[in-house]
Amino acid sequence: MMNRLLVFLMLGAAFMLVVSAIDQDANEDINKRGIPCLCDSDGPSVRGNTLSGIIWLAGCPSGWHNCKKHGPTIGWCCKQ
């Protein structure tokens, strides 16, 4: 009985370690890149065009500029 409990705890710990590592990597990617948006210079449509802007909720930070005349409903579409 004790061996089964120990095996169960070890498998649970290994699972939690893997899940926490995957989640941490996903958060780092979002922090680095943000949510992409379509700048006016990208073209009229999302299809086939790269999304070169990033949505910022509290305005564009220093070194960035608003790249869309009519921005997204929430936040600003900014480009470096």
From Swiss-Prot:
This is Delta-actitoxin-Avd1e 1. Expressed in gland cells and nematocytes. Binds specifically to voltage-gated sodium channels (Nav) (site 3), thereby delaying their inactivation during signal transduction. Has a strong effect on crustaceans and insects and a weaker effect on mammals. It strongly inhibits D.melanogaster sodium channel (DmNav1). It strongly affects the heart sodium channels (Nav1.5/SCN5A) and weakly inhibits the brain sodium channel Nav1.2/SCN2A. In vivo, when released into the medium, this recombinant toxin induces impaired swimming, paralysis and death of the crustacean A.nauplii within several hours. It is found in: Secreted; Nematocyst. Disulfide bonds join C37-C77, C39-C67, C60-C78. Its main location: secreted. GO terms for molecular function: sodium channel regulator activity; toxin activity. GO terms for cellular component: extracellular region; nematocyst. InterPro entries: Myo_ane_neurotoxin_sf (IPR023355). Residues 1-21 form the signal peptide. The keyword Transcription regulation does not apply. Belongs to the sea anemone sodium channel inhibitory toxin family. Type I subfamily. Residues 22-31 form a propeptide. This protein is encoded by at least 3 different genes. At least 3 other genes code for a similar Av2 with a Val (instead an Ile) at position 35. It comes from the Eukaryota. It holds the Pfam family Toxin_4. Keywords: Cleavage on pair of basic residues, Disulfide bond, Ion channel impairing toxin, Nematocyst, Neurotoxin, Secreted, Signal, Toxin, Voltage-gated sodium channel impairing toxin.
